[in-house]
Amino acid sequence: MGKIELQLKATLENVTNLRPVGEDFRWYLKMKCGNCGEISEKWQYIRLMDSVALKGGRGSASMVQKCKLCSRENSIEILSSTIKSYNAEDNEKFKTIVEFECRGLEPVDFQPQAGFAAEGVESGTVFSDINLQEKDWTDYDEKAQESVGIYEVTHQFVKC
C-alpha cells in the first residue's frame, strides 16, 4: 500500500510552530482495510511510543489489526522522521505534518484532539495542550497583549 501523508490546513492567528507533542501523542484515525474495503466505525489511535511485532518476524508497526470482515492482518507505522510543525508561513495552505507506512490499513479520516502545542509569533509564548477537536482554538497571549487562535482546521490524505 505504501506511504500516505496527512496534510493539515488551518488559519493561524498570531501563533506558529503548531505541532503534536511527545511520543504519546494520539493520532485519532478511521482505517480502511486494503483487502476488503471495510472502514472502522470507531476512532482508533496510534502513538509513536507503541510498537507491535509483526507475524513472522517482519519487524514492527505502531498498530497491527485483524480486519473484522476478512480476517486479514494489517498494520500501520508512524514515520517519526516525517513529523513536522505547521507554521505561520503555511497559513491557509495544506502542509504534510506526518507520513504513515501503510501495510493493508489505509487512514481515511483524522480527528485532531488534545496534545498539540504552538508558540506566539511575536512573544514566543508556548501554548501547550491545545485541543483541536472542535477544529478551532483561541487564547490570549499576555506577553504580546493580543488574541491568538487556530481556526478552520481541515485535513487530507495524500498517497506518496
From Swiss-Prot:
Binding residue positions for Zn(2+): C33, C36, C67, C70
Transport listed as a keyword: no
Residues found modified as Phosphoserine: S75
InterPro entries on file: CXXC_Zn-binding_euk
Assigned protein family: Belongs to the UPF0587 family.
Quaternary structure and interacting proteins, as annotated: Monomer.
Domain comment in the entry: The N-terminal and the C-terminal half of the protein have a very similar 3D-structure, suggesting they arose from duplication. Requires a bound zinc ion for normal folding and solubility.
Name of the protein: CXXC motif containing zinc binding protein
Species, as recorded: Bos taurus
Gene, per the UniProt record: CZIB
